[in-house]
Amino acid sequence: REGVSTSMLARHTFGREGSKVIGILLAAVMAGWYAVQVGFFGSTMSALFPNGGIITSQYVAAFWGGILMMVTAYMGYKGLNILSYIAVPSIAILSVVGVCVAVKGSGGWNAIMNLVPPKPMTISASIVAIVGSFAGGAAAQSDITRYAKDAKTSWLGTVFGYLIANTFVILAGYLITAATGESDPPVAFLAMGLGVAALLILILAQWTTNDNNLYTASLGLSNCLPFSKHKIVVVTGVLATIVGAMGLADYFTAWLNILGVALPPVAGVIICDYYFLKGMKYEYGAGTVYCKVNAWAFISMIGGMVIGFTVHWGIASINSLAASVVLYLVLMKTLGRGNSGIIGEETEV
């Protein structure tokens, strides 16, 4: 709707200087996702070329794969667009074929839906993990959809591309791994007899996801660092690749749990400010006046995180989101009157 990045949106809520903290936080999250996907790439290459020697071993492949993925992010939005034209149709076809093979191989829908995983999760833990898997992308959504021609196109792209298509791909992955009993997707694809083509498409899926992760991380950092976006892409990409090659993907579930609780309060504060306090009226460009730091926004965000991690009833993601919205609304309507808690002022030039 606003046509700006998440970091720009945060300027109105957290302040001109405060938004830099949010930019760094989101950059760390997306760089972390980059590292995780680099690890998955290494696993896929190892499964694809088990006799390829050290060059296709999991951690070495993760390193050179991360460097290659950095190229399209370096090219910017044009690079993302070119790769997506190739990858998206291939991923859709693989998902449909994978679901059909999984269902048929398991004896039908009833049989596959009755499969019990070796380590089942509780409903609340599952929801937190799901929110964690979506939270990073949701936070970065405006970084991608800001190029949409209007608000309607942005919403349609988000609903169909992210909520519907992405959910179907995740469901397809679950059905394939459930049908084979393999938790590692590359191994599961091979176990189902989908072959090398499936692994190549899986690599494309990882690539298209990861160049977006690095692109978004660079946008977040460019909001607060005096360097060009290209330099930030290279430095962030190399550091995230090293972390990924060291095995961050081995802690994937823990990573999702952290994101599922920590990111919703950031969104909660921005949503509350935009819809409930500012009436969906944000201004940008020369002459726009921002506060430097909105202390109430940070207190609400941190309060939501604390509640999400410490309150053990209900669903942690919803608890942290709701707490941040309520806290921010109450603080701004009471203590926030008369610019209390609003530190400094800065005019956009």
Language model: regions and residue ranges:
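Juxtamembrane transmembrane-helix boundary signature
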Residues: 1-13, 23-29, 333-341, 345
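Hydrophobic transmembrane alpha-helices that form the core helical bundles
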Residues: 19-53, 207-223
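Transmembrane alpha-helical segments of multi-pass small-molecule transport proteins
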Residues: 23-26, 50-75, 89-98, 122-138, ...
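Membrane-water interface regions at transmembrane-helix termini and the short interhelical loops
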Residues: 43-52, 65-87, 143-149, 216, ...
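Membrane-interface loop-to-helix entry segments
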Residues: 60, 64-65, 69-102, 117, ...
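Hydrophobic alpha-helical segments and their helix-loop junctions in multi-pass secondary transporters
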Residues: 73, 89-116, 126, 130-134, ...
